[in-house]
Amino acid sequence: MMVSRLLKNYSLYFAWLTALIATLGSLYLSLVRHIPVCDLCWYQRVCIYPLTILLGIAAYRTDRGVVKYALPLVVLGFLFSVYQYLQQMIPGFAPINLCGSTSPHCSEIHWEIFGFITLPFLGMLATLIMSFFLIMAFYSLDKRLAN
């Protein structure tokens, strides 16, 4: 009961924290560790980076209405992550030619642990976590309006 109340009351903060960690992590890996960024990675970043600002402001203002704007970005980022992960993990997966000649190929694995955790996998995980917290925020909004 206490965990449920904690999740409902602070779900926007947890979603914002997840977006912040994902943003800072991707910036660290590209700017400090110099891991090359492919086009699909950029598309994922376009979906995640604005969430850091949107969710931060919404959490500060306790504006749960942001869910209807943030969730589509999260879902789109998830789809880009899944597509890139499939390109990396399934040999012969026919990629759509989104990658330009100057950027690294999207199917290249530049960082991997345990044989299956790659950067797109972490992107999928972050978007799933954000989706969970945003859905919790949405349902707590419905209950508050009903009371």
Swiss-Prot record:
Gene Ontology terms for molecular function: protein-disulfide reductase activity
Highest taxon listed in the record's lineage: Bacteria
Membrane-spanning intervals of the chain: 9-28, 43-62, 69-86, 115-139
Bilayer topology annotation: Multi-pass membrane protein
Main location: membrane
Family: Belongs to the DsbB family. BdbC subfamily.
Any Gene Ontology biological process: protein folding
Protein known as: Probable disulfide formation protein
Disulfide bonds: C38-C41, C99-C106
Any Gene Ontology CC annotation: plasma membrane
